[in-house]
């Protein structure tokens, strides 16, 4: 086949494949253009997850009648003029690819007006300008993108669900709203505004506008300035963490970025203060000279390279350690030490205490008769889930004789049974036990609710309020009693008994599940969240009786070999396996 020069329409569609992957990509490019136009107010609205329409309105500089046709030509831009400008980029965009790429796969209406000039309207379909005329309007621009991917239907097959695509756009606008707290940025989905930042330059006020005051309250302000580097923002104390990096928002020269280097710095700064897989919450602004970074790495400009990576790494690590060392945050501080909360969820029975004498560190033989010596007390909550008469019959299914050899690294229970060495992950095992019991509870009836003596007042985001309103029934089934207190606040009056002391944290976790549109698995995912939060954590020292209780309950639990997330609870080596390793 002969080599041919592709026409502009095909070239633009190829470029669109790199730049415009999904509706959120369109939102990103239009939002960056609005920021570069020196806008003070930007409104983003989407409909149909962004496939039906995406509208971005700003009060920026606008586009003139003469410039507008150029705006839809590839590599036409007002951001740079020569090669040297690439070394000191401060604008969000600079490639001149966004508008032609968007136009090639959608229908676009543009309304724009520059100061002291007439307003204009332009209609573009599939990359072709079909109408261009003067049109009265306010200064600034309004761009409406409709029928995204109408001429590339195969692209739609690779998109996620409407809920997921809508959330992608929502999360993206959040990043820019926090990167630029000096600009009032709002986001609306299906004509309902989910947030609007005040644009007064205060990061705290922007966080409150987006997430609510309860999100901001535990965060710690940080600030550090060097000769050619400054870092400022908010970080979470070790006791406040998530299981992913979703709320690690990092901006370099006010540009949202992803950086493995900075993620490693966060991991190092929090090393020894978080449990395995936990991630801190951070909102950080890093300012460096524009010629010390390279943003021309990826078409989406989401990755950058630092000229002096070691300096950035050391500075961020040092700031985190100095801030967190101001108080003696130890890992043990973040683990549940209050034994006034049950080790297992108890169903309507008195608290019981098993009298077990102090056990030696060296192996000891399990003796169920000794464990059955019980006395009534009023304070020790580490009780079996089952009532005692039920537990006795169930435990007969457990190993008749085994040795608990001890605890390894305050995280694993070592167990010997029938010439087999078993290593039990205490968190995964306890999580499986609690999950199975909660499933039984919720299968039999509505969740066991504990009414709070003093209702908790929670300040939430508008999106969270919308999610609560739409999911009242399933939250009630889980055991939550909520009452609206204001446009953005609720009274939490009752919660599932199992999450006592962790009400706020668990509700926020469930709100994330609701936002993700888990559908028919939502209830099960919420139960997993509650079990995970309640389960004893890695790094928690257990006494003999507590280890014994986990082992007894684990082996009478269905599917005991894996936790609800699918990770193994127990790993076993037979004596023959060990002898083979030692070449005996």
Swiss-Prot record:
**Role, per record:** This protein is involved in the repair of mismatches in DNA. It is required for dam-dependent methyl-directed DNA mismatch repair. May act as a 'molecular matchmaker', a protein that promotes the formation of a stable complex between two or more DNA-binding proteins in an ATP-dependent manner without itself being part of a final effector complex.
Would you tell me the protein name for this molecule? DNA mismatch repair protein MutL
| Statement: the UniProt record of this protein carries the keyword DNA damage | yes
Biological processes annotated in GO: mismatch repair
Its transmembrane ranges are none
Q: Which GO terms describe its cellular component?
A: mismatch repair complex
- Under the GO molecular function aspect, what terms does this record hold? ATP binding; ATP hydrolysis activity; ATP-dependent DNA damage sensor activity; mismatched DNA binding
Q: What HAMAP family does this protein's entry cite? A: DNA_mis_repair (MF_00149)
Q: What family is this?
A: Belongs to the DNA mismatch repair MutL/HexB family.
Reading the lineage from the top rank, the first entry is Bacteria
Q: Which UniProt keywords apply?
A: DNA damage, DNA repair
InterPro entries from the xrefs? Answer: DNA_mismatch_repair_CS, DNA_mismatch_repair_MutL, DNA_mismatch_S5_2-like, HATPase_C_sf, MutL/Mlh/PMS, MutL/Mlh/Pms-like, MutL_C, MutL_C_dimsub
